[in-house]
Curated annotation (Swiss-Prot):
Oligomeric and partner information: Interacts with ORF34.
Name of this chain's protein: Protein ORF31
Transmembrane regions: none
Pfam families on file: Herpes_UL92 (PF03048)
Gene Ontology CC entries for this record: host cell cytoplasm; host cell nucleus
Record's signal peptide: 1-25
Family of the protein in this entry: Belongs to the herpesviridae UL92 family.
Cited InterPro entries: Herpes_UL92
Length: 194
């Protein structure tokens, strides 16, 4: 979804109109019945646009059934596993090129790939990131950014700054997904559930 920023909308102060990049349908993101609300620990956000809805939720939203979306088509297994393999390789490649990440690379890398433990954790948590791949422009880069953010936050012994780390935290929805991945990752590490 992209915000409609036409001169007419700006003149009348309408900043809640969005247009789907794929089907070109319009969405009024005002917390009403059209919004698909996602409850996070910090706030309530519209899943379609990523806008924070706290304090802007219309009462009619709670009177009917909660809207939800389903997958339109099945996931291609070969593409899914190919993407996982690329993700694991790219995570290590990115970390090897950054300064101050030697300790992290030693913890998670095995050659050009990740260790078996890290591989199992990524396999288990990747399902959380599927919505990002389907609806965001540059979805793969966002997913890489999420995993890099999670890995650096868990394995780093000092502060690491990189633009790739902050790409996933600009949008509340993607930040929420990254937090779910991190929570699941930490649970799997603490319970040795890999």
């Amino acid at each position: 979804m992209k915000s409609v920023a036409s001169p007419l909308c700006q003149f009348h102060g309408v900043f809640c109109l969005y247009q789907c990049r794929q089907c070109l349908a319009y969405h009024v993101c005002d917390g009403g019945a059209e919004c698909v609300l996602l409850h996070t620990p910090e706030s309530v956000i519209c899943e379609l646009t990523g806008n924070c809805m706290l304090g802007n939720i219309q009462e009619g939203q709670f009177l009917g059934p909660v809207p939800y979306r389903t997958l339109d088509n099945q996931v291609d297994r070969d593409a899914y596993h190919g993407m996982l393999a690329c993700l694991k390789r790219d995570i290590v490649r990115y970390l090897q090129t950054w300064p101050d990440t030697t300790v992290i690379v030693q913890e998670i890398a095995l050659g050009d790939g990740v260790t078996d433990t890290i591989s199992a954790i990524i396999d288990e948590t990747f399902g959380e990131c599927l919505p990002v791949l389907g609806e965001a422009q540059g979805g793969y880069a966002l997913v890489c950014s999420m995993y890099l953010h999670v890995i650096v936050s868990i394995y780093s012994t000092k502060t690491v700054y990189n633009s790739m780390l902050f790409k996933c935290t600009k949008n509340k929805k993607y930040d929420c997904i990254a937090k779910r991945v991190r929570t699941k990752w930490m649970r799997m590490l603490s319970t040795k559930d890999t």
